[in-house]
A protein has these predicted regions:
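Short helix-initiation/N-cap motifs at beta->coil->alpha
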Residues: 70-81, 134-135, 172-187, 220
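Periplasmic-binding protein-like
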Residues: 34, 116-124, 197, 201, ...
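Extended ligand-binding regions for polar small-molecule ligands
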Residues: 54-64, 125-130, 144-154, 224-263
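Ligand-binding clefts/hinges and TM-proximal coupling segments of bilobed small-molecule sensing domains
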Residues: 8-14, 67, 137, 150-173, ...
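Secretory targeting signatures
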Residues: 1-20
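A conserved helix-loop-strand patch within extracytoplasmic ligand-binding domains
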Residues: 66, 75-78, 96-99, 103-160, ...
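Extracytoplasmic small-molecule ligand-binding "clamshell" domains
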Residues: 25-95
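A ligand-binding cleft/hinge motif common to bilobed small-molecule-binding domains
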Residues: 77, 94-106, 160-161, 186-220
């Protein structure tokens, strides 16, 4: 199918393509926030977006009979605000729709049925002595650490709720991008980074042995695709049908195997 990839690192509103939210528009403008592998990432050599969410966006655009336009946002918080304001037709960026975070987000946007179950992870440098039990990292283990997290995420919300208020010599700092988080961690500015498990595994795998996962935080989150509140463009039924059909016909399992290495 045809895909228009707006340059990574740039924000381009839907006015660049006309009224993309119109039912007569040939475009489905999907906002995302890279890098967040294996859900969404970008190949700077060939200018191609790729990942689990990108593949699903392609399926959804095809089902709607539209050309997919991927619009990358440098700031995850701005992406969430813009989908709520109708600047993009849909947001596909590993967005948590469950729990307290999801309840707040549902005030300004609407979600598809869940398409992925997720937990969090604590990433540290390979020389760190922090190790969590199989039952997961506890807030008590994290309270004394300097932790970096991406602003506007469910990771930050968890840390604010369970760790920040009980800090004993530690700190929680939000940064705009995942790249800046990784740089701050590897440079020794922070002792740990909290991020969703899937991206944590990808980041560690590509770190050349400099990073490791100290343990998981079992938050039992559900991801959903977000649209403007109330679904004014009436695309949620199609999105939900794509999710349901992909699970029934084996497409979902194939995508999980491709991007996560398992069934």
């Amino acid at each position: 199918m045809a895909i228009i990839a707006l340059a990574a690192g740039l924000y381009v509103g839907k006015t660049a393509l006309g009224s993309s939210s119109s039912s007569s528009s040939p475009y489905l403008v999907v906002g995302t926030n890279i890098p967040f592998p294996p859900f969404e990432d970008y190949n700077y050599t060939n200018g191609v977006y790729f990942g689990f969410d990108i593949n699903f966006s392609m399926l959804i655009a095809s089902a709607l009979g539209k050309t997919l336009v991927i619009d990358n946002y440098a700031d995850f918080s701005v992406l969430l605000a813009d989908v709520g304001a109708g600047v993009v037709d849909m947001a596909a960026s590993a967005i948590t729709e469950s729990g307290a975070v999801g309840a707040l987000r549902n005030n300004s946007m609407s979600f598809s049925i869940p398409y992925y179950d997720a937990n969090q992870a604590i990433v540290v440098t390979s020389g760190s002595g922090l190790t969590c039990a199989q039952t997961g990292c506890t807030a008590a283990q994290l309270e004394a650490l300097s932790i970096v997290v991406q602003t506007g995420t469910s990771s930050q919300s968890w840390l604010q709720q369970y760790v920040e208020s009980n800090e004993t010599g530690g700190s929680v700092t939000g940064l705009t991008t995942v790249d800046s988080e990784i740089l701050a961690l590897t440079s020794g500015e922070f002792q740990a980074m909290m991020i969703d498990l899937g991206p944590a595994q990808s980041i560690v795998a590509s770190s050349g042995g400099t990073l490791k996962i100290a343990g998981e935080v079992f938050t039992n989150e559900l991801y959903g695709f977000a649209v403007p509140h109330g679904d004014p463009n009436h695309i949620l039924p199609t999105i939900n049908n794509v999710i349901t059909q992909s699970e029934a016909n084996g497409t979902y399992a194939k995508l999980v195997k491709e991007w996560f290495g398992g069934a």
